[in-house]
């Protein structure tokens, strides 16, 4: 079965381990054995049977956005196994202009992590960008954190009400650790979801229940490398009690349709 990993991150080799450790520290996680390099992603992906990877960057500081986007382009351009996204920060001078530059560079979407970037999904500074990219660039949003409300699902609902043509991937079943709240707020909105960084925290049968409530056609497979080992996450995914059709849909068809791969 073909697999597309819709949720991965890579870093320059010289800072990859430090960046990975920083992410784990942010979530108070330890170990894992992943180093955040492109090389390890490819090795682990091959072992897991993953054929394509969506590469998602995040800029914690506004002044690093352009350099990070240039790095992602340099690592993904001309490589059919990669789908490169750029990143945006609400604190940068002109988010909409950088989004246009991403299009020019051939990057395929925008990734934002509101909790680590410290701005809300519905930050007023982002509204012109959301308007400009409707129907042009999809947005992958980290969703949910019990410590902050930057990425609360209600904020995404507001944005989707304002910009109904905005293409959004709501990561982590729409809200890490707040799955029922996310479902109540987003079940009727036009967005898709990924399963990353969630399956290990759900009790038996919960993932299947939400997958079927949303519909497999709205769910996409993701590992959140280097937070987790793609091999382990792929095995965890295939332990779900789903039909072959549901595995096929989540494993690659949703990503292919949504990202026009």
Segments predicted by a language model, with ranges:
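A cross-domain feature marking catalytic cores of carbohydrate-active enzymes
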Residues: 8-10, 57, 86-90, 112-114, ...
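Mid-to-C-terminal alpha-helical segments outside catalytic/metal-binding sites
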Residues: 1-9, 13-52, 216-220, 231-261
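Catalytic pocket-lining loop regions of alpha/beta-barrel enzymes
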Residues: 108-109, 119-220
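Active-site gating/metal-coordination segments in enzymes
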Residues: 51-52, 60-140, 145-146, 201
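A general structural detector for well-ordered alpha-helical segments in enzyme core domains, enriched
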Residues: 40-44, 68-75, 98-102, 125-129, ...
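Conserved, mostly hydrophobic/aromatic
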Residues: 7, 45, 72, 102, ...
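Active-site environment of divalent metal-dependent phosphoester hydrolases
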Residues: 11-14, 60-63, 90-94, 117, ...
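A generic "structured core" feature
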Residues: 3-11, 102, 129, 162, ...
């Amino acid at each position: 079965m073909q697999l597309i990993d819709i949720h991965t991150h890579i870093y320059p080799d010289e800072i990859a381990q430090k960046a990975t450790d920083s992410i784990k520290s942010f979530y108070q996680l330890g170990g894992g054995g992943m180093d955040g390099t492109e090389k390890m992603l490819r090795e682990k992906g091959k072992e897991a049977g993953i054929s394509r990877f969506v590469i998602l960057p995040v800029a914690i500081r506004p002044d690093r956005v352009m350099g990070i986007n240039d790095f992602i382009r340099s690592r993904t351009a001309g490589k059919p196994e990669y789908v490169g996204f750029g990143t945006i920060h609400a604190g940068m001078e002109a988010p909409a202009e950088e989004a246009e530059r991403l299009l020019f560079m051939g990057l395929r979407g925008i990734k934002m992590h509101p909790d680590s970037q410290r701005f809300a999904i519905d930050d007023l500074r982002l509204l012109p960008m959301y308007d400009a990219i409707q129907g042009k660039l999809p947005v992958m949003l980290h969703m949910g954190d019990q410590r902050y409300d930057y990425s609360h699902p209600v904020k995404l609902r507001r944005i989707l009400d304002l910009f109904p043509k905005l293409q959004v991937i709501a990561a982590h079943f729409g809200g890490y650790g707040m799955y029922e709240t996310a479902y109540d707020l987003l079940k009727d909105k036009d967005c898709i979801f990924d399963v990353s960084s969630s399956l290990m925290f759900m009790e038996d049968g919960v993932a299947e229940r939400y997958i079927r409530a949303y519909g497999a056609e709205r769910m996409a497979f993701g590992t959140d490398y280097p937070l987790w080992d793609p091999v382990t996450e792929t095995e965890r995914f295939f332990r779900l009690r789903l039909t072959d059709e549901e595995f096929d849909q989540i494993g690659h068809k949703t990503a292919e349709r949504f990202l026009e791969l």
